[in-house]
Amino acid sequence: MNPTLVVELSGDKTLEPHRLGGKAHSLNHLIHAGLPVPPAFCITAQAYRQFIEFAVPGALLDTGAPGNVRDMILSAAIPAPLDLAIRHACKQLGDGASLAVRSSALEEDGLTHSFAGQYDTYLHVRGDDEVVRKVQSCWASLWAERAAQYSRTSAAQSDIAVVLQIMVDADAAGVMFTQDPLTGDANHIVIDSCWGLGEGVVSGQVTTDSFILDKASGEIRERQIRHKPHYCQRDPQGRVTLLQTPEARRDAPSLTPEQLQQLARLARQTRMIYGAELDIEWAVKDDRVWLLQARPITTQAKPVQMLYANPWESDPTIKERAFFSRMDTGEIVTGLMTPLGLSFCQFYQKHIHGPAIKTMGLADIGDWQIYMGYLQGYVYLNISGSAYMLRQCPPTRDEMKFTTRYATADIDFSGYKNPYGPGVQGWAYLKSAWHWLKQQRHNLRSAGATVDAMIALRQRETRRFLALDLTTMTHQELERELSRIDGYFLDSCAAYMPFFLQSFALYDALALTCERYLKGRGNGLQNRIKASMNNLRTIEVTLGILSLVETVNRQPALKALFERHSAQELVTVLPTDPESRAFWQSDFSAFLFEFGARGRQEFELSLPRWNDDPSYLLQVMKMYLQHPVDLHTKLRETERLRHEDSAALLKAMPWFGRMKLKFITKLYGVMAERREATRPTFVTETWFYRRIMLEVLRRLEAQGLVKSADLPYVDFERFRAFMAGEQSAQEAFAADLIERNRHQHLLNLHAEEPPMAIVGGYQPRMKAPTAENAAGMLSGLAASPGKVVAKARVITDLLAQAGELQPNEILVARFTDASWTPLFALAAGIVTDIGSALSHSCIVAREFGIPAAVNLKNATQLINSGDTLILDGDSGTVIIQRGERADG
């Protein structure tokens, strides 16, 4: 084997970085120090240069056209001596061995430049021929636009080496940092670990455990043991696939104390060798720890600073005194969001929200900067700014009534004054009140027509969009399509907003009336009253799924397919199998036409909708087939209880109070129905945005400009600037921007969740450990009346864990949105960390007649699947009784 072309990484100190590239030199450095590194060879930078001189004409190199050079590299034959040397290295690593083929740029993994993700890496590669092809792909990645742009700004050399390394078939794997990545504290080692291969950690596909260790002693300072429903492993073809974690390991630590000590010792040694803080990829096999990669942390953490939800605010008084809350922000933005989701919310804030709220009757919609705010990946409403604007309207003239409904118990309003000022006064207020009154008259007269128009718009635009072939449309045609979506997105949000706000106002009026006339006896009534809301869209989805299940039950051959295949398999089986093709093309397609734009966190454009991935729907259908649900009977029983409860309480009220309550109840039901009828229209428009983004990224990936997998880290407003011709692809999808966004999202995942409501600044910190095996009572908000004793089922990943829910278990979740509704039909009760009186969990739980308690803050951390819970939906309390875990 020619050592100038291919060399074994043996720890030989004479092997220099300009031959090996950063990654290979780093591995060789670790091997020299005696650290455990899997066997590896390096195809040197000289080998790449020899190939380029042989395969690519100098004239082509001089043109500077990366795409043409890349194509030439991929199609050219490798000189025989080099080809033989690569194959010999494969043989040395083991015939049929599973290899990692990794790019090793000359300055990659250096102390000043990371290049993480800019050049190609291929894992679990088998066979000499495939290894040779992947080596060429790594060479070609040097000429990808994303890498070329990044390397120009970093002044990197234009040669590249490639590492061939034995893959560790890991029992557990992950990453560790030799300093706290959030705070920069160099006294800590932070470790993330999962079962199986580490690809799931890097990609975010799997849930991880987290550990914080004292660097000097290795003592465990904090640990977060999470429910881990899935892990990554290789299938027989060598492909990385997502598998269900065995029940016994789902809530068990993925690392033992001894393994943590091994990792801490290796972290200290590696840190000493490099003389810099590192992030290290590692794997454990048969209780032995292997180091896979070590990269200096080139983006140094800054000292922890106070964060503000409105960092753009220049007035320090407003910055310190503005009140922000994420209570009742709507399920479309509840929970942690990716950089793409956050940037889409900012697009909405700047271009949609203001014109949309004008339909509420606001004469002055203010400035976009006072609508919303953002903290560590979470979206907030600027309550101070909203209350200031709403003083234009007579019903919300008392701003503290509006403000306090968004507060949590820990917010102290003594001495609070709205930092934006007192709002409109005198003659200006009279004019704004008159404007509001005229708008309400218009809204009431046009409400029915508005609902009909929004339903028709959604159906018409869905039909039109599904008929488009995005792959054949030009850049300009896609840009025109985006502009069309902008217009209808604004129209549908403007139509929805009055119904949304009126529902809130009427629910508050309902609560006040119950309190005035019934005192404490009215709690159950205000939670059950809803005036024939059986047509809510969330209920329609579940009824639609049940209708599909009835169709399947009538066809034995089709039912057999559902019983034989997993939900993921059914996605490919149903469209092609003769027994199911008609069902897929008719009944199922009709359902998707109506509801397919639904999904989780619908402003989070990185998440697939049911049209994109129907496996969740198919999983629910499998559950309903196994555990039949009589939803119509359940809804009738709920209505009967509501009627009996209401009649008994109303009878004790004076006639005026009785008439007032009946009127509010009826009006609330009408507004809630209108709200739910118009909401799907703007949700559908967000799916159109997502589909066009995916198509554009597909094209850019083919040009080597960006990877489709980078979608969560793309900035939506930069994407729009690129589509409008205002920015180049290199500017809009700059590699360093994508990497910064990825890094920030990783920090948000590790950080403690910021408060639900906050005045002024917030100091971020890493997630604090929760009391393990805690038992006792949790208190939250009474959401849906009733009491139940049942086993808990904690679900933190809907798509991955939906199939775990068993009939008559209490569903425990961070929060729920419309996509969770089908599970409510099986649950005995609902418990959530986040929620309010009008959140999805409450509305649907009341409709299904099951008790619910929401806003318990950390229920998903304190409750384990299998615990016995005593859920009191009238008081909002949950008592945890530790016991045997539920099966499966």
From Swiss-Prot:
The Gene Ontology terms for molecular function here are:
ATP binding; kinase activity; ligase activity; transferase activity
Enzymatic class: ligase
List GO BP terms, alphabetically: antibiotic biosynthetic process
Q: List, alphabetically, the InterPro entries matched.
A: ATP_grasp_subdomain_1, PEP-util_enz_mobile_dom, PEP_Utilizing_Enz, Phosphohistidine_dom_sf, PPDK_AMP/ATP-bd
The protein's superkingdom reads Bacteria
**Might you give the EC number(s) for this enzyme?**
6.4.-.-
Q: Which UniProt keywords apply?
A: Antibiotic biosynthesis, ATP-binding, Ligase, Nucleotide-binding
Q: Please give the start and end residues of each transmembrane region.
A: none
Q: In which pathway does it act?
A: Antibiotic biosynthesis; prodigiosin biosynthesis
Q: Entry's SUPFAM superfamilies?
A: Glutathione synthetase ATP-binding domain-like, Phosphohistidine domain
Q: Which Pfam families match?
A: PEP-utilizers (PF00391), PPDK_N (PF01326)
Gene3D superfamilies on file: ATP-grasp fold, A domain, ATP-grasp fold, B domain, Phosphohistidine domain
Family to which the UniProt record says this protein belongs: Belongs to the PigC family.
Q: What does this protein do?
A: Involved in the biosynthesis of 2-methyl-3-n-amyl-pyrrole (MAP), one of the terminal products involved in the biosynthesis of the red antibiotic prodigiosin (Pig). Catalyzes the transfer of 2-methyl-3-n-amyl-pyrrole (MAP) to 4-methoxy-2,2'-bipyrrole-5-carbaldehyde (MBC) to yield prodigiosin. It is able to use substrates with a variety of monocyclic rings in place of the pyrrolic ring A of its natural substrate.
PANTHER family this protein is in?
A: PHOSPHOENOLPYRUVATE SYNTHASE-RELATED, PPDK_N DOMAIN-CONTAINING PROTEIN
Q: What is this protein called?
A: Prodigiosin synthesizing transferase PigC
The organism named in the record is: Serratia marcescens
Q: What is the lineage of its organism?
A: Bacteria, Pseudomonadati, Pseudomonadota, Gammaproteobacteria, Enterobacterales
Its gene name is pigC
